[in-house]
From Swiss-Prot:
Cited Pfam families: Cupin_1
The protein's name in its UniProt record: Germin-like protein 1-4
CC annotations in GO: apoplast; plasmodesma
Quaternary structure (record): Oligomer (believed to be a pentamer but probably hexamer).
Gene3D superfamilies: Jelly Rolls
Glycan-linked positions: N60
GO molecular function: manganese ion binding
Upper taxonomic lineage: Eukaryota, Viridiplantae, Streptophyta, Embryophyta, Tracheophyta
């Protein structure tokens, strides 16, 4: 055993070095290379293809680049809103000063008794949700060791409670109280991205996911799939 100890120590040291080098790669966004890099929307030509926006010249930076008043105003969760919920995002698309800082926030308003933020995921960020008012049932789906098996991690979160949704996992929130609910979420990405499961499969994908693929996946008739698709507004 004594002869093997140096090898074990060497392997452990090597693993520690690899983990320390990999740690920055596990962050939601890349590390920043300067104190500030306020997004310069006007200089962007075509769609964004990098992890961040071009930087505005520092001489042109103002306090307004780091300010957003939108999270203090309730959103309409009733008018033509089948989900009974509304998200107000405070990402780099609305706060240019967030560029390269790797954080963002959102406010979610829910109608009482059933207002839901339907199953969705954030491919680029972990979310921590704070219930500012009301009562929310929340949950996320995690894969288990059994083949093709998943488990729902769920609970009711009261006012003042906090719940964490791990990065990339499908999750939802639903109001279960008799008054409107409000939640504030924080993300470890300037632009976490949101992919709503139902809309991605049945609605906004272009081209659309083939009906026969969905029929086989959900083990239903193609007519059922077409009926569901008809309820979504295709982009």
């Amino acid at each position: 055993m004594a002869a093997k100890l140096p090898t074990v120590v060497l392997l452990a040291s090597f693993a520690a070095v690899i983990l320390s080098l990999a740690a920055p790669l596990l962050a939601g966004d890349p590390d920043m290379l300067q104190d500030i890099c306020v997004a310069d929307y006007k200089s962007l030509q075509g769609p964004l293809r990098v992890n961040g926006f071009p930087c505005k010249p520092e001489a042109n930076v103002t306090a307004e680049d780091f300010f957003f008043p939108g999270l203090g105003k309730p959103a309409d969760v009733y008018s033509g809103n089948p989900m009974g919920s509304a998200v107000t995002a405070a990402t780099v698309e609305r706060i240019p000063g967030l560029n390269t800082l790797g954080v963002s926030m959102a406010r979610v308003d829910y109608a009482p008794w059933g207002g839901a933020n339907p199953p969705h995921s954030h491919p680029r960020a972990t979310e921590i949700l704070f219930v500012a008012d009301g009562l929310l049932e929340v949950g996320f789906v995690v894969a288990t060791a059994a083949p093709a098996s998943s488990r729902l991690i769920t609970r009711v979160v009261p006012k003042g409670g906090v719940f964490v949704f791990p990065r990339g996992l499908l999750h939802y929130e639903r109001s279960v109280g008799e008054k409107p609910a409000v939640a504030i979420s924080a993300f470890d990405s300037q632009l976490p991205g949101t992919q709503a499961a139902a809309d991605a499969l049945f609605g906004s994908s272009s081209p659309a996911v083939p009906t026969d693929v969905l029929a086989r996946a959900f083990q239903v008739d193609g007519g059922v799939v077409e009926n569901i698709k008809s309820k979504f507004q295709h982009k």
